[in-house]
């Protein structure tokens, strides 16, 4: 293993506050990790922490530092006050520097139900007019201002070496709302079409490119209705190829999809300019949802554009097999052969079943040329799975 490769762990700041910096640093070192990737902006949720023997509930989406309020307009972040007042991020950065360990931050941009519920007019709106309140729309000027303000604020206050960006795009229609219930199968093409946003800003953007949005809406409405009515047809294997089929048959869908890609690319490039001006490397997930990396377009992300903007593309290598992991990097290299790569691994029980399983996936990523490996997530793992990370990292060292 190259000495420059970063072996990191995703860490929640509340885990640092609860366990103490010394214990967290010890856990990282025992797992043979040389980088702490500490969250600074996160969504709400309920999380099982096995070593703490607790379920932790985050009732709102928020940041873990006190913002510079002069930077913001209508959209203003909510603050995890205890974490911010305790200066957890600054203390963790200092501890990492003293230990010779890398300090990065992991930043969630537009996946914010707290702000979305307060400002539904700034969220993604599907063909039926439903509002996805967990997803601020990147085409909205007010949302763009918020993203740039929060990003700048984070870099100025947290001062990471690198920032890993998540959920700064169009989130898909299926994202795990509280008690999300659906009795019908949702095929890939149906989910893709229901991820299309038709808010005023997206319509204006598309019309400025001479796209007939009225025709697109009629087409999407018809296709979605047919797919819903067909029901079980979406379960046949051929359906997986339906998106490509529809893009070729209907140029208007292709052009509207390109408008979505450009909206995301615009905001990512603006964040890259900010990071570059402050001497911070910008890394990013191609998608915030762990589907195949070549489906990142569901969230309006072009792999080619992402690779051109980001300092490092870090896909969620969460597939069900080593072959899936290998394909992840193959797909990126097809469109961006010179891309700088990282890899994020989840130790979810449905995907990783042993230390050998994890090590095989990590080796696949290393063979693909990744420069960083990040494991999810320190607070969500028991000691057994933390040891799997140690074994995987030791195995990588042996392959050097």
Task: Give the ranges of each region predicted by the language model.
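Aromatic- and acid-rich polysaccharide-binding/catalytic face
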Residues: 38, 45-46, 235-251, 298-324, ...
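Active-site-adjacent "subsite" loops/lids of carbohydrate-active enzymes
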Residues: 4-11, 104-158, 175, 182-203
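Active-site clefts of carbohydrate-active enzymes
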Residues: 231-253, 283-289, 332-360
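An active-site-proximal structural segment forming one wall of the substrate-binding cleft
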Residues: 26-33, 92, 135-170, 305, ...
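Aromatic-lined carbohydrate-recognition surfaces of secreted/lumenal glycan-active proteins
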Residues: 8-10, 14, 102-112, 164-171, ...
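Aromatic-lined carbohydrate-binding/catalytic grooves of carbohydrate-active enzymes
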Residues: 33, 38-83
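Substrate-binding cleft of secreted/luminal carbohydrate-active enzymes
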Residues: 309-325, 345-400
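The substrate-binding groove and active-site-proximal loops of carbohydrate-active enzymes
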Residues: 7-16, 66-86, 130-145, 252-263, ...
């Amino acid at each position: 293993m190259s000495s420059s490769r970063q072996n990191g762990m995703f860490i929640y700041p509340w885990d640092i506050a609860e366990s103490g910096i010394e214990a967290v640093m010890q856990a990282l070192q025992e797992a043979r990790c040389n980088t702490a990737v500490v969250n600074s902006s996160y969504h709400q949720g309920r999380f099982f922490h096995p070593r703490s023997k607790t379920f932790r509930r985050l009732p709102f989406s928020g940041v873990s530092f006190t913002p510079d309020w002069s930077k913001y307009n209508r959209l203003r972040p909510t603050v995890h006050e205890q974490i911010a007042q305790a200066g957890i991020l600054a203390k963790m950065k200092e501890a990492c520097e003293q230990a010779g360990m890398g300090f990065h931050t992991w930043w969630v941009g537009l996946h914010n139900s707290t702000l979305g519920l307060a400002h539904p007019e700034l969220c993604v709106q599907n063909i039926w007019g439903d509002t996805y309140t967990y997803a601020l729309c990147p085409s909205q000027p007010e949302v763009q201002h918020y993203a740039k303000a929060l990003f700048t604020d984070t870099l100025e206050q947290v001062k990471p070496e690198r920032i890993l960006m998540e959920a700064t795009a169009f989130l898909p229609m299926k994202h795990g709302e509280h008690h999300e219930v659906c009795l019908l199968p949702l095929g890939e093409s149906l989910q893709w079409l229901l991820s299309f946003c038709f808010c005023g800003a997206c319509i204006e953007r598309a019309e400025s490119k001479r796209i007939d949005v009225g025709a697109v809406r009629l087409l999407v409405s018809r296709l979605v209705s047919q797919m819903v009515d067909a029901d079980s047809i979406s379960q046949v294997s051929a359906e997986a190829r339906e998106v490509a089929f529809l893009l070729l048959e209907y140029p208007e869908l292709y052009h509207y999809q390109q408008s979505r890609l450009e909206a995301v690319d615009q905001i990512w490039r603006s964040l890259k300019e900010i990071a570059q001006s402050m001497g911070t490397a910008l890394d990013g997930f191609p998608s915030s949802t762990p589907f195949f990396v070549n489906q990142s377009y569901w969230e309006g992300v072009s792999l080619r554009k992402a690779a051109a903007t980001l300092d490092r593309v870090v896909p969620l290598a969460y597939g069900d097999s080593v072959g899936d992991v290998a394909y992840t990097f193959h797909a990126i290299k097809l469109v961006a052969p010179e891309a700088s790569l990282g890899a994020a691994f989840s130790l979810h029980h449905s995907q990783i079943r042993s230390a050998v399983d994890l090590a095989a996936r990590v080796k696949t990523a290393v063979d693909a040329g990744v420069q960083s490996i990040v494991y999810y997530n320190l607070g969500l793992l028991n000691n057994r799975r933390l040891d799997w990370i140690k074994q995987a990292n030791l195995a990588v060292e042996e392959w050097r």
